[in-house]
């Protein structure tokens, strides 16, 4: 269990940034139906989770600052023995207090939330702060209600984004642990790679190995691509036959992430099926480029640098290599390179796999990034990426995953 002081501290930071005479309203969200009465596995709104540690539907959180005094209340669904018979035991107020670091007196029945909401919406001396980054309808419905009365509503996600961008030790260690679980699962899956193995077999092995290491809510849909399926970057429907079969002389691309304490890993690995046939093997030629890009990327990352600057450096290195292969002209432009370099090199990482933060923001110590240079060459019938996770430090960056990219670990069979 995560130390509740972490969530208490997050709320203190949030409240310190909250303007006076303001009430912030956040919601965990509601379960989503898959079909009929079957539901998807639930994941709380990430800003709500950041402030509470609660991963259950139907909760509301109200943090108010009035005349400098901060009050916090969480509203929880009442226990219902009939619902619990079908869906399992629900937390009682003491359980909720233990997770969130709130006093039990600050945990209230959800029925009281409507009364509190009405009181706040009626009070014109209190400004309302809602989460405009939410995928839920509730904040936007409330925004419409408040604005009908001529009052302005502020966006609390500006506060949570600034907090979530700078990771605390618990957060970086959670990402490190998620990366460890992910890589252990990849290592176990690698043992199955051989000519004739299917994407489906490798996919199920990855998810089994992550689940048995206590990661059930994965960071994103697991990707396993054999051969030319690697040209579909988010190939998340593994095939049992046809193009989904690993062939001698081809590749297997995996892109996968465990989740630990709510935090995501994002790891991509490529494996070569069968021994390369000398220096002319195009898999090895492309691997040499990707390894050079990775080294340059991790050398580049540090405080004050940007995603745009990182991409620019990757395009320059890749462009010179592509020109040397006769694939683009020597006087290439960025557009020439992007015919082969399809995606951004990096993104923020945290409670979301593509975590919050503006893409034009300079890197700062405490940012966590996933770094994934990738090149895809249709003329060669091959393309792949290798991805690792890192923490921006005061003088550069620190890998949170292993950084494996040696040919010895990539060639299988």
Regions from the language model: what does each represent?
Residues 1-413:
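Active-site neighborhoods and metal-handling regions in enzymes and metal-associated proteins
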